Amino acid sequence: MLAATCIALLVSCSSPPPLLNSERIEQRFGSYGVEVIRADENIRYSSLHSLENGEPVTRTLAVVEFADPMPAPLRAAHQQIVSGESIGATFKSAGWSIDKPLLGYDVLAASPRFGRVYELMGLDEPAPLAVHRYRLQLLQGDEALEYATISEIHSPAYLTAEEVREIYGQPSSGPTTTATAVDDLLAPLLEELSSATGSAGG
């Protein structure tokens, strides 16, 4: 009986960690890439995409608010990320473990305002978009450092609100509203994308 209990504990302890978003996209769609759409020293907007008929289709639009100041042990990896590398993959390869304390969930209601986002996601018409926000913390030995606050806006072809909740569980502080915060964060990107479209059309 004791041996069986020990084996059960070993199996439980050896369960694989949750997939990174990049890993989940590749597993579901067969490919993965990241493209930085807009970035400065404070914030990065990026498309986490897979290829469909050779073209990138956004599965998650990620808005990353970087820690300020950036902790010294993270600066080298941070430069790679600012240059366009995947956040999760970069820190994982550098030996950091990743923790994602959840801040909250919400849904961006379907609206023509997000037309350019829908285009990136390959959607033909407006649709509700599941969003969630979390802190990205990095752990190595006795060190625990906060890197960023991240908001992820998911294509309904990838993750629905129900699926997001199943994957990430409940916020430790209880449900919170994130749609207003994410809407505000998206404003500069939407303006830039609209301007780019107008310039190309003109």
Task: Describe the residue ranges of each PLM region.
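Generic signature of intrinsically disordered, low-complexity, basic-rich segments
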Residues: M1-A4, T58
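Composition-driven recognition of glycine/serine/threonine/acidic- and proline-rich low-complexity segments
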Residues: S14-G202
